[in-house]
Amino acid sequence: MLTTGHLDAVDFWSWYARWWPMLLIGLGGLLLLEHFMDAGSPWVGRRPMGGIVWLVILMIALGAVAREGHLVGPFAWNFGDHNNDDFWSWMGPEHDNDVQIDQALSSAKPSITVNVPRGDVTITPSTDGQMHIRAHQMVHRSSDNEARQLFEELKPKVETSSNGAVVTVPDKEATRVDLTMEVPAAAYATITAQHGDVTADGLTGGIQVTDDHGDVKLEDMAADAHARMNHGDFSAHNMQGKVLVDGTGDDVTISEVKGEARVDGEFFGDIHLEQVSGTVHYHSSMTDLEIPHLVGSLTLDKSDLSISRAAGPVRVIAKSKDIDMSQIAGDAHIEDSNGDVTVATASPLGNVEIADHTGDVVLTMPEDASFSVTGNASGDEDIRTDFPLHMTNNDGRQTLDGAVGHGGVRLHLEAEHGNLELRKGSSATLSMNESGDNGETAKHFKAPAGAKPTVEQQ
């Protein structure tokens, strides 16, 4: 009946996804009833149960597959994050349709709200100060009549007011609608997407995005941006306001931000930030850091943290990370529990505190620097220094203390289970020129989409 079209496949699998546990209960009830009815019959032998067991396993497997496809967005393999259109093609051929909507707006700085259950959203500024929507509809149905009916039901609904407009795409199973929108540049956009990518470029009024399954890409924005992620990558480039990202996801790439950059949540891919004029905040279950001014770049993955050219006071608290920091000016407070810590300072110098529970600590100071230092490591590890300082070994602990030059800044170094090393380095001054002295970026930095490659990358 499914293959002949007498029973709608979408309706059947939606029903089965919801009610398959009741079928199992019903099957169990029938078997129990049969057992009691045959209990008084001595000639009834033991029936083989292999077929029943395999039937139960098949029902559970089909129920799990149907329910997963129903919960993550009906038939998400067909209209999911990677646009795999083949899995559910047996439901019927793909039908496509385009809808154009032009809407006048009374406000010069409207509030635009967009709700899309499945599909991508792309927003750019309009040239006439009005709103223009192009909706590309995609459905899998066995007949043209069904597809035409769905196209009409899927037409975006636009509700206008004196403050702006609300654009809503109806939620229909096994469908997808991609929106390409042009809105007034000064509009404040609020976008909610359940399954699909969100791209915004050139807005000056600000944007807030909530995306459950999909990537978010923002570029050339002249106001604040806030994204709530669940699954997917986030990128923002050339942002004049704040950039705030929270939730869970994969890669995060943020570059050329004039305001604050804040990442709060569990992101399991690579984290890349570069040239942030405001304060950088990052918080997860494994890493907590704050950098008042990131002149260079920051790279973070599951095992490494690299920071290049940053102005303090820098604060880093990490677990199970190898930390590599270069050209760090001002105060720095660093804690690590399972990994090596390597820091090279730059002028203007500040107080430096490093505590590492398990791992080596290496600090490089300019050879002409003035500072006082206290440091300690366990007795079975090594302490090495290029400076004329006092070292002792008492009660299973090695210590390092003394002053260089006229004292100056204070250093406090602890390596609970690891080597401690204080090195001489060349003098360096942190330039606040965001283009950098040599054009280099931190290792592993992934340039934002659309950025021109360097000579080395070419």
Model-derived features: positions:
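Short, surface-exposed interaction patches in beta-rich subdomains
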Residues: 97, 101, 150, 170-172, ...
